[in-house]
């Protein structure tokens, strides 16, 4: 028996927060690897010398909102002294190309003169954030978008549980998480003192952890691992460990980073989409929405090689289902916008819309990926 399609026009969320729903994110990590080598992806991707061209590439595809990084380690090489010479070309290039930017203030890196474990780190980051806000205000901005600390949960795990990169220790992930939350809270308060209308995109991975068997112990372990993804947002909002300074006014836009390997069993085995334990993205988005009731940006998503377009298609489809149910999905940002040598091992990561530059500064275009984005843009425009 055929049924009439459900009319979702009255409940479907209509995104209005950003200049464009489809967006691009530039790889801008400045982490130090275990051997002490700093990996600046803005440099290794060639983006630092191709700012106007790279932003123009996004604009030409209708990606008018983007994420990029203000590299703190370069801006504050000397304590309390800010050299904006690496940032101002980025700001002006974005303006020239009509790109609305979400500026990351710390993406796994910090100035060499600071000890991340000390109280001074928090104070210094807040001072840097304040200086950034003052600069933006002087440049005529009243309500810019910032991400104070990118992916605190992942940074805490990678940097202080498994020593993948700086601070390069093990067994201190919880301690680092609290320190980064303190710094984020202090930075957001400092920014809002200078720019009361500033907005914050608070990014972390969106994951699902399933039980490895049906025993009560395994199910409880999976539940705890799954719910751990919410700790940072709970801390920033003051729900968890309010002594860190968080409160509900700081929990602004939830930024979700979602990749093909973001679902796994509690024993560490990655889930494939055909596994019965796999959860549709729309359900995960609904879970976040009901927990926080905040606007959601899928702040990073992507796959490598030929999987790029099919992965995006699935993410857009699932986001659309969530929006049909009134969930406030405000955008989807593809990552990376341009290819880069992977920060973990220097291999090329062929996941971008555009490839690594040649000697003339030209980048190849991944046609299936770009065509998929264009198709979805048309569909979203027609949907109103």
Regions found by a protein language model. Name each.
Residues 2-50, 55, 59-61, 73-384:
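Non-catalytic scaffold segments within catalytic domains of secreted glycoside hydrolases
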Residues 69-71:
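Juxtamembrane transmembrane-helix termini
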